Every structure is written in structure tokens, then in C-alpha cells.
Amino acid sequence: MMLQQTQVKTVLPYYERWMRALPSWRSLDRAPIDRVLKLWEGLGYYRRARNLKAAARMVMEEYDGKLPENEEQILRLPGVGPYSAGAILSIAFNRPTPVVDGNVIRVFSRIFAIRGDLKSGPGHKQIWRLAEYLLPHQRPGDFNQALMEWGATLCLPTDPRCSVCPWTTQCRAKKMGRIDQYPSFAKRPSTKSVFMAAVLIQNNGSVLIRKRPESSRWWKGLWEFPSAEGRSQREAASNLEKELGLSFEKAELANIQHQITNHRVEISLYRAAWLKHRKKPIGFRWVSPKDWSRYALPSAHMKIRRLTLNNSAK
């Protein structure tokens, strides 16, 4: 699940930390969602963490705490699609089930010179048929892992290492001198700008944060420095001031850039004073530096947290 849309080298430290904390389906099922999100903090795509916890509940309730070895059953688990099912069944249970990820698509598209949109439609189906046809019944997990590793280490998106590739002489894209034209995908959606304002509110060494509602389009259930969106940075700041009933210092403390899929998020960070007689709003919490380890923040707000900790240490 962690490897969905994330490279192995990025996942490894998270995986090791996760397995130390939640080594079984039972421990994951019993863990509070806040702890699960905290362990996932920084890895992104937090829906995967929620799906994994939901899958743990299903494994405990329907499969007696054991991961099913049947493809139909395993595909019922939240967050498990054909790619994850193939990887789990072939690697963990030695079942001859194909795996198709971005690396496999790239390798096959170049070797067999497959054109078209390979993430959907006829091209995608052709890739899956090839993966199924070529998959050996002996050690299918090793084959799938080797194929994915091939794409990750040799058949790279740019500057592929064709000189050491064992299939160079059979690669049609290489023979045609068009290796850079494969694979071809549908045009990516244009990047959209998102303007946000966040505020740093401190009181006696603690910082005010709040939990994002489940209705949020991003970062639902994670903690954040109070923030708001707008059509511009100025409007975002104005919206946040109105929401909190506060006035910000005019000088911007920092400007944080963050990318979420095809959205470029720009967060302007401001500072505001907290009146001692004022009551803390519902859903907000004062957090001291020693308690940060209890709260999961999205990566963009982790940058703000580092900034506040660095400033407080000076």
C-alpha cells in the first residue's frame, strides 16, 4: 500500500517505523486513527493510511486476522486494486498473478513499441495481457519484482541505461531510435494555482492548531496551523482573518510552496496575537514543542512547524 505512487527508497524508513509500531492486523485495527496518520506523516496520499486501517478491520472481522489468498477476496479490501492484489498474491503467496505499475508499463511499451494512452483503454489492456502471458508459474513473485526493478533502475523515464540492459537488442523502441517517445500518455491536466493563508498564533510557548474537517478536499483529519483559501493571497488572508476574528501582522513570515497532484499550493504564513481573555475555539488545541510528536500534520504544515521550532530555538 505504501508503494502505491511512491518509490521504494522513500517508503523504507516509513515501513520500518510502521512495522515497529503496528506489526499485526490486530494492532492496526485497534490503533486510533490519529496514531495511524501520525505514523504515515510525511508520506502523503493519506487516503492509503485510512484504507489500510479499514482493510485491517475487514481482515479481523471477515478473515479471522489472516490476509486472504483469493484474488476476488483480496480485491474487496479497501485500497487494494489490481496492482496491489497482483503484488501481494505473487510475492507473499507465490500465486501467478501479474503486476502492472508505471515501471512495467514503461518497460513493455519500449520493448514492444506499444503506443497510445497506456493508463487506460486498449493500450492499458494490451500491457496487462502481456504481463499475464509472460508471467511464469514458477516464482511469479520474483519475476514481478524483477520486472518492476528493471523499470526502476535500468529502463528509466529519462536517460535510460540501455548500455547495460539485457534486452537492448530486442527492444523495438531502441531499434527505431525512439526510446524517448515511449511510453506515451494522455496529456496531463494543466497545473492549477491554489492560494492559501496560514497563521502562527503563540501563547506562553504553545502554538494554536486545529484538526481539518472530514469534508476537506485535502488533508482531512490531519492537524494544521489555521488556514483558509482564496482566489489570491490577499483574499485568503482576509478570509482567514474573518473566520478567526483576528487581525494579522502585515509582514509575511514565510511563503511555503507545495505540490499536490496537479495543484501548486502557495501558503503565506502570518503571525497574529492572542488576547489572554479570549476563549479557544472549538476544535482548536494549544500544543507545546514537546507534544508535537502526538499530532500528524500534512507536509506543507510540517514545513511551518519546522520554521516555528527553528525560531523558538534561537
Regions found by a protein language model. Give the residues of each.
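Catalytic cores of DNA base-excision repair glycosylases
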Residues: M1-S163, W167-M176, D180, S193, ...
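Intrinsically disordered, low-complexity, charged terminal extensions of DNA damage-control enzymes
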Residues: E149-K314
